[in-house]
């Protein structure tokens, strides 16, 4: 910043009197003011920055969650959310979470009709909680549920640590043992088993196949009806019979059937209900979740730390109070988006050098 020179010269004589006023060097700084429009000033401080794209980072001063289960190798977040065998582990607590799976999220183990329900939203629902844990006990006794006794079905595409066959830990595939006959709708109550103050996320579903397989497994080859109800939300489904091409998941045997998977959220102390016919996937282990975690769309890995996480620019450190560029969701200690750059005038209004005035 160039110095402002104030010079006042008064010369008194019988001759002419010459006066000069405030002068300064030429100023390149122009600011827009509310009352005078564009004004030249002697100095400014920039208040805005235009970020460049960078990698995402851990948010300073808080825990940031990338994958739901960092130690569950070769598992999608949906695998973890459904508790697929070999994809069960600890989900770290976090105040901020990264939505990092940009393509349609799928799960292995058994062919799922993902588009029939909101099941792809389950990982995002879990990300929105600070603390998430899978219950150690099953919410109901599936083998003795109404319409049973049942044996619990497994799949060769779901190997667990002790067997070549397994299934999702959140659900039990209820196959009638001896009473393979059609049934009227049956009702099972789903109790609340989480700790006080936790939301309970209960996963359930149903299996359907071609007519021959439905008759063999359940004794009924007709479409089956299913309903879930919890927290004032009721959902109805009717199973599709046949019409599925064979599909193989993760090197297992080709499957002619499909499963439809959904979930319901039970608030503290509230009981849920499931009304079902043949082919039901009864709930088993449930998610218990509490607190809130801010979620932002991003990418992995998380490298270093940043003041702010921005959906378009990644990790940002706050060097200025405002920023220009793309406006998008951001979390943390973030600059404020403005349309045009802002400057703080820290000098005075520029005045051109005063002209010499001659008085007689």
From Swiss-Prot:
Processing and modification events after translation? In natural infection, inactive HA is matured into HA1 and HA2 outside the cell by one or more trypsin-like, arginine-specific endoprotease secreted by the bronchial epithelial cells. One identified protease that may be involved in this process is secreted in lungs by club cells. Palmitoylated.
| A GO term from the CC aspect | membrane
The protein's GO terms of the molecular function aspect are: host cell surface receptor binding
Give the UniProt record's GO annotations in the biological process aspect: fusion of virus membrane with host endosome membrane; fusion of virus membrane with host plasma membrane; symbiont entry into host cell; virion attachment to host cell
> Where does the record say carbohydrate is attached?
40, 74, 160, 179, 246, 317, 346
Q: Where is the signal peptide?
A: 1-15
Instruction: List the keywords (alphabetical).
Output: Disulfide bond, Fusion of virus membrane with host endosomal membrane, Fusion of virus membrane with host membrane, Glycoprotein, Hemagglutinin, Host cell membrane, Host membrane, Host-virus interaction, Lipoprotein, Membrane, Palmitate, Signal, Transmembrane, Viral attachment to host cell, Viral envelope protein, Viral penetration into host cytoplasm, Virion, Virus entry into host cell
Q: How does it sit in the membrane?
A: Single-pass type I membrane protein
Q: Where in the cell is it found?
A: Virion membrane; Host apical cell membrane
Assembly information from the UniProt record = Homotrimer of disulfide-linked HA1-HA2.
Function, as annotated: Binds to sialic acid-containing receptors on the cell surface, bringing about the attachment of the virus particle to the cell. Plays a major role in the determination of host range restriction and virulence. Class I viral fusion protein. Responsible for penetration of the virus into the cell cytoplasm by mediating the fusion of the membrane of the endocytosed virus particle with the endosomal membrane. Low pH in endosomes induce an irreversible conformational change in HA2, releasing the fusion hydrophobic peptide. Several trimers are required to form a competent fusion pore.
**Family classification:** Belongs to the influenza viruses hemagglutinin family.
- Other facts noted in the record for this chain: Major glycoprotein, comprises over 80% of the envelope proteins present in virus particle.
- The entry's protein name is Hemagglutinin
Annotated organism of origin:
Influenza B virus (strain B/Victoria/103/1989)
């Amino acid at each position: 910043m160039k110095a402002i020179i104030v010079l006042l010269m008064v010369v008194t004589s019988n001759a002419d009197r010459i006066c000069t006023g405030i002068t300064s060097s030429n100023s390149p700084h122009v600011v827009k003011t509310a009352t005078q429009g564009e004004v030249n000033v002697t100095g400014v401080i920039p208040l805005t920055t235009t970020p460049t794209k960078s990698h995402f980072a851990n948010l300073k001063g808080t825990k940031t969650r990338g994958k739901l289960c960092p130690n569950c190798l070769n598992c999608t977040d949906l695998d973890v959310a459904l508790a697929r065998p070999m994809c069960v582990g600890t989900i770290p607590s976090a105040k901020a979470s990264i939505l990092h799976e940009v393509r349609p999220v799928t799960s292995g183990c058994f062919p799922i009709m993902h588009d029939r329900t909101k099941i792809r939203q389950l990982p995002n629902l879990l990300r929105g909680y600070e603390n998430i844990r899978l219950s150690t006990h099953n919410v109901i006794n599936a083998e003795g549920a109404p319409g049973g006794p049942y044996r619990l079905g497994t799949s060769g595409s779901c190997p667990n640590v002790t067997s070549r066959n397994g299934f999702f830990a959140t659900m039990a595939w209820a196959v009638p043992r001896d009473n393979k006959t059609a049934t009227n709708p049956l009702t099972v109550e789903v109790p609340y088993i989480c700790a006080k103050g936790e939301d309970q996320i209960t996963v359930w579903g149903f299996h359907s196949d071609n007519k021959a397989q439905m008759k063999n497994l359940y004794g009924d080859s007709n479409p089956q009806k299913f309903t879930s109800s919890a927290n004032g939300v009721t959902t109805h489904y009717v199973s599709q019979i046949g019409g599925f091409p064979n599909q193989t998941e993760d090197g297992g045997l080709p499957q002619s059937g499909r499963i439809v998977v959904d979930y319901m959220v039970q608030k503290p102390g509230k009981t849920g209900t499931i009304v079902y016919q043949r082919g039901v996937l009864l709930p088993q282990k449930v998610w218990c979740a509490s607190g809130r975690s801010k979620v932002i769309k991003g990418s992995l890995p998380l490298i270093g730390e940043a003041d702010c996480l921005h959906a378009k620019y990644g990790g940002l450190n706050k060097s200025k109070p405002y920023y220009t560029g793309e406006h998008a969701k951001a979390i943390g200690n973030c600059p404020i988006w403005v349309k045009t750059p802002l400057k703080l005038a820290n000098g005075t209004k520029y005045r051109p050098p005063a002209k010499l005035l001659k008085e007689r």
